[in-house]
Amino acid sequence: MTGVQTCALPIYVEECEKVVKIMAECGLERGKDFKVWLMAEIPSNIILADQFNKYVDGYSIGSNDLTMLVLGCDRDNDTVSHIYDERNLAVRRAVRHLIEVAHSEGKTVSICGQAPSVYPEFCEFLIKSGIDSMSVNPDTVKFTKKLAAQIEQRIMMDALTGKGRQEVEDLNW
């Protein structure tokens, strides 16, 4: 997205509508060179994605906060931190739902957080779900790019040969 300015909003639908309107009044209108994205970090952002689609061009999933809020646990609290896991079915269903709803109207979806670089199976889940981009820590970029390329190559080979892993888990919303 070189040369494209973006503005990320972590808010409710009504607030999003107001902010986009105020931005337009100030000369910041959505277009080819200015994109408005929503930080999808709270469950309501996912649940109401169909309504947010009217006001945004894309979503950036904040996987750390989204996981914490979907699972109702604090990853920094030793008493419950063992529950915190981006690979949890509820988190994956939320992520896939957002990708599907966003893509149904031509919106872009990115994810930021450690999970794609820490858990290869989560990286694979994201790719199979259609994620548009992943943002990871600088020290894991090379590893994650290589991992993603290997996963994409395997998916293509599986499609060509009719072999490979079959998804059995229900990820539908």
Kindly give the residue locations of the regions a language model identified.
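Short, small-residue-biased leader/transition segments that mark boundaries at the very start
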Residues: 1-9
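Conserved, mostly hydrophobic/aromatic
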Residues: 5, 41, 65, 126
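Hydrophobic faces of well-ordered beta-strands that scaffold small-molecule active sites
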Residues: 8, 36-40, 59-62, 109-113, ...
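Catalytic cores of alpha/beta
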Residues: 15, 44-55, 115-131
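Generic long, charged, amphipathic alpha-helical segments
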Residues: 23-26, 30-37, 71-115
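C-terminal helical cap(s) of enzyme catalytic domains, especially alpha/beta-barrels
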Residues: 71-82, 127, 141-165
